[in-house]
């Protein structure tokens, strides 16, 4: 089964649901905060939702990420 998320997007959202901040995610993955925000925005746009929270809920529902 093909994933909706790229490997990096999945890494970011997996950290997001663990309560990591954008800054912490950037540090953990050795990327800039802007890059983290861009990945999050891309996923929000892909899903057609309004926020990070809605994206997380939708991704869990779609079984793209696990709690």
Give the predicted meaning of each segment:
Residues 1-33:
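Helix-turn-helix DNA-binding segment
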Residues 10-14, 44, 56:
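Hydrophobic residues on short alpha-helical segments
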Residues 39-42:
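Residues within the DNA-recognition helix of helix-turn-helix
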Residues 45-67:
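Basic, Lys/Arg-enriched C-terminal extension of HTH/homeodomain DNA-binding domains
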């Amino acid at each position: 089964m093909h994933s909706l998320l790229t490997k990096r997007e999945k890494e970011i959202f997996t950290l997001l649901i663990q309560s990591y901040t954008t800054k912490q995610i950037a540090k953990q993955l050795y990327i800039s905060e802007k890059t983290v925000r861009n990945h999050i925005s891309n996923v929000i746009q892909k899903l057609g939702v309004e926020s990070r929270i809605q994206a997380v809920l939708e991704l869990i529902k779609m079984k793209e990420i696990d709690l």
